[in-house]
Regions:
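Mg2+-dependent endonuclease catalytic cores in nucleic-acid-processing enzymes, primarily RNase H-like
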Residues: 75-213, 232-238, 242-252
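Short, flexible loop/turn elements at secondary-structure junctions
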Residues: 22, 66-68, 93
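ATPase catalytic-site recognition across NTP-hydrolyzing enzymes
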Residues: 1-64
């Protein structure tokens, strides 16, 4: 029972921490990384850092995290047949909502796509001191095609859903590009944030931490999980799947 619980939390990294074979013992990966083994496998298959075109006819989504201390992270994703194409990533802090709305408009223009839905976490429906929600403020700024993803009661369920989706994913080269922080410091790109998102080590007596480490990498990881949870809740159903509406992106 303990091993099953640990495997649920740690995913493929369980093999490095608690190996069953010598090969598993010497497998590489960021210690405690939640998505690291998936990203590593994608790299080995040539699916990270790929150059491909966005499909203007494919279902297109943004997935958000509205983090603590005014941090916001957003992914741009297309569904292409049975695959998920992660086109772009953006993260910033100490910016007004209008800044992010303008970024969404820039994405649509620069990538030649129309966003089907902007997927926001549950706290976007929370009302501020003036009785206005984040979603309503977005609408006032012209972003009306919004879906709020219900709050999950189990963060690991969403994490495991994202692990499954990652196995069918491609990441554009721009999602690896370094970013600049509010003070001009260099920050990791989207893919690197996913690789560095990690679980807490077991406590005294092997007690399992109930939540991952919350740090500068968790905002981008949580935004990706927003997409996965929207998928599992069926919020993307009925939008087509790329096989019906689009064509597979050309890669070179």
């Amino acid at each position: 029972r303990w091993y099953a619980r640990m495997a649920r939390v740690m995913g493929a990294s369980m093999k490095q921490e608690y190996p069953g074979t010598p090969q598993e013992a010497f497998a590489t990966g960021e210690e405690g990384s939640i998505y690291g083994s998936r990203i590593m496998a994608l790299r080995e298959r040539g699916r990270v850092g790929v150059e491909f075109e966005a499909d203007p006819d494919a279902p297109t989504f943004t997935a958000w995290d509205l983090g603590l201390s005014d941090h916001t992270a957003i992914w741009l994703v297309q569904i292409m047949g049975d695959s998920f194409h992660w086109l772009d990533h953006y993260a910033a802090s100490q910016q007004p909502l209008a800044h992010y709305v303008e970024k969404m408009k820039d994405w649509e223009k620069n990538h030649g796509v129309a966003v089907t839905f902007h997927l926001l976490p549950h706290d976007a429906a929370r009302r501020d001191a003036h009785g206005i929600s984040y979603v309503e403020n977005m609408g006032r700024l012209g972003l009306v095609n919004v879906r709020v993803v219900p709050r999950t009661t189990d963060v690991w369920r969403g994490i495991n859903t994202l692990r499954e989706l990652l196995e069918r994913s491609f990441f554009h080269a721009r999602t690896q590009e370094k970013a600049r922080g509010f003070c001009g410091e260099e920050e990791p790109g989207g893919v690197e944030h996913l690789e560095l998102y990690r679980s807490r080590p077991p406590g005294v007596g092997g007690a399992i931490a109930e939540s991952p480490v919350h740090d500068g990498h968790s905002h981008t990881a949580d935004a990706a999980r927003t997409f996965a949870e929207a998928w599992s809740h069926g919020l993307l159903h009925g939008t087509g799947n790329g096989r019906e509406r689009g064509r597979r992106a050309r890669m070179w």
